[in-house]
Amino acid sequence: MEHVRVIFFFFACVLKIVPFICLAQKDKYEFPPGFNCVASGGNFTANSSFAGNLNGLVSSLSSLTSKPYGFYNLSSGDSSGERAYAIGLCRREVKRDDCLSCIQIAARNLIEQCPLTNQAVVWYTHCMFRYSNMIIYGRKETTPTLSFQAGKNISANRDEFDRLQIELLDRLKGIAAAGGPNRKYAQGSGSGVAGYPQFYGSAHCTPDLSEQDCNDCLVFGFEKIPGCCAGQVGLRWFFPSCSYRFETWRFYEFDADLEPDPPAIQPADSPTSAARTERTGKGKGGSKVIVAIVIPIVFVALFAICLCLLLKWKKNKSVGRVKGNKHNLLLLVIVILLQKDEFSDSLVVDFETLKAATDNFSPENELGRGGFGSVYKGVFSGGQEIAVKRLSCTSGQGDSEFKNEILLLAKLQHRNLVRLLGFCIEGQERILVYEFIKNASLDNFIFDLKKRQLLDWGVRYKMIGGVARGLLYLHEDSRYRIIHRDLKASNILLDQEMNPKIADFGLAKLYDTDQTSTHRFTSKIAGTYGYMAPEYAIYGQFSVKTDVFSFGVLVIEIITGKGNNNGRSNDDEEAENLLSWVWRCWREDIILSVIDPSLTTGSRSEILRCIHIGLLCVQESPASRPTMDSVALMLNSYSYTLPTPSRPAFALESVMPSMNVSSSTEPLLMSLNDVTVSELSPR
């Protein structure tokens, strides 16, 4: 009977973890684009034949059927002249129906953003669309351009870095150019340098180009690197006829996870085709049979291994201890699942090793204490410094955070996210091990009158851009799509070079990319009041726009040097809320007065643009807030015109007394900005 209960609990564990392993990466397209209205192409009049043809072409997109290769060549009009020509192209991993939807949206927005322009192009995250009054099919075009850089340069092995980068891109260029008339795309990896052991890249041309034109277009793009972004650990370049990308982390799907191309049509009497199909397992049908057989076998084997481990563990422990520490069963399953991705061997850390590293968790090594435990500085025997988070044994919420951080952070790799080095399970002990961040958290600098004088505008702008890239990775580019839910200054750690790293994923939530246009709800609201979006604080409704709101608050805090205390302060109960104050100054055209007086240098136009972006992020309506993809575009491209912000959501204090919010074990402080359920992040 006891074994039956163990097996039942095991299934409950598996069901709990399935969302983490089954949520495949799916890209979306509903992001504000990078427009370029080609001024050199001239203009047309609203009542011209070209205007009618262009509008007709865009309208006809809604009646098209999706194509298998993500490429659309379109034209509208008769032979009398003033025909409209257009091309649409999607990234390789975008599903067919999503691709067509992306191009439809891009086309509609492009003619709205570039009215009466003869030629224009727009790049979305996952597709591009261009139109012209001249034939563009089969003709290489390398202007205009759009580019993004990571903002971080390689600090050593520069020559080797540049050589291996170009070597990888050149190899991908050759593969893409030879791709044939349906698709000219290549993705792949290559050897890197110390600190970045693997390089990743992609190259893409519109398939209407000849092999030579595709090659020339990409070469033209590669030649841009030395003048703008040599040594950058990440970059993207977009041209009307081609694009390429280089990163030090895998940003693309594996080939096996991509939607397969349709089989090539062979003549019915082709013996070569028949023989090839037989040798490959009767084509697609054979692979489906193999998948149908292999998947159940894998799950049965996984179940058998888990069950054996569970029963062996149970045999060596008393029943009372099992009941008292039931979550260790779930954690054993987590280890097995991590082993599937070759993480567990390197992530599991022995308890005695951590005791030695922290001098038996000495109070002298304690960096901070939060609602779910303490954080200690430690040093491994090899000299590596670490931050050790020891969760409280009595905190049920700590269990939840522990599982979250292992399952998420173990598979998240980004320069602007804190890195999980390992974890430990020893009886009642639950311990997480992180990289050690020397400069502690952002709040220690930005809210300290003396320390924030060390932060010139260049450093603050780097912080804003780094946090934006980290959130964009969580929302769009990571293996999982994640809503952080507790972004705040104390959860932004700063390394030795003041690069920001997002920390504390205990409250993070996975979300299904098929449902990104809708909101999710929770009856248990957790987070920090000053950074909570109103729809989340009041109704428990959250989405990626919840993180965008928190980011906007953070941007305004970084620029003003003030905390968002929701209309209260320690010395003045009638103090004006930070967002309210900034909004009032914006409306009264005295916005320069909100800039931190210690910011004596730096581009005022750049600072004002960041305030503008911050106000867009804290708008009351979630639908009005930009996505992080859009924010990254706003920060990197001054050609993008910022929309006018609407009223921020700053009147939260009126609803706070009636809200059922999870609280930490710490007493509430005077500032509502500090009311939080999050523990102190590793430093």
Swiss-Prot record:
PROSITE patterns in the cross-refs: GNK2 (PS51473), PROTEIN_KINASE_ATP (PS00107), PROTEIN_KINASE_DOM (PS50011), PROTEIN_KINASE_ST (PS00108)
Molecular function GO labels: ATP binding; protein serine kinase activity; protein serine/threonine kinase activity
Region listing for Disordered, in residue ranges: 263-283
Modified residues (Phosphoserine): 490
Domain Protein kinase residues, every copy: 361-641
GO cellular component: membrane
TM segment ranges: 289-309
Domain (Gnk2-homologous): residue spans on this chain: 32-136, 142-251
Keywords for this protein: ATP-binding, Glycoprotein, Kinase, Membrane, Nucleotide-binding, Phosphoprotein, Receptor, Repeat, Serine/threonine-protein kinase, Signal, Transferase, Transmembrane, Transmembrane helix
The protein's Enzyme Commission number: 2.7.11.-
Residue numbers on the Cytoplasmic membrane side: 310-683
CDD domains documented for this protein: Gnk2-like, STKc_IRAK
Record-listed Phosphothreonine modification sites: 528
Modification Phosphotyrosine occurs at: 434, 536
Enzyme class: transferase
Membrane topology, as annotated: Single-pass membrane protein
Positions of ATP binding: 367-375, 389
Cell compartments where the protein resides: Membrane
Top-rank taxon, per record: Eukaryota
Residues glycosylated per entry: 43, 47, 73, 153
Catalytic activity, as annotated: L-seryl-[protein] + ATP = O-phospho-L-seryl-[protein] + ADP + H(+); L-threonyl-[protein] + ATP = O-phospho-L-threonyl-[protein] + ADP + H(+)
Protein family per UniProt: Belongs to the protein kinase superfamily. Ser/Thr protein kinase family. CRK subfamily.
Classification via PANTHER family: CYSTEINE-RICH RECEPTOR-LIKE PROTEIN KINASE 28-RELATED (PTHR27002:SF1091), RECEPTOR-LIKE SERINE/THREONINE-PROTEIN KINASE SD1-8 (PTHR27002)
Name assigned to this protein: Cysteine-rich receptor-like protein kinase 28
Lineage of origin: Eukaryota, Viridiplantae, Streptophyta, Embryophyta, Tracheophyta
Gene that specifies this protein: CRK28
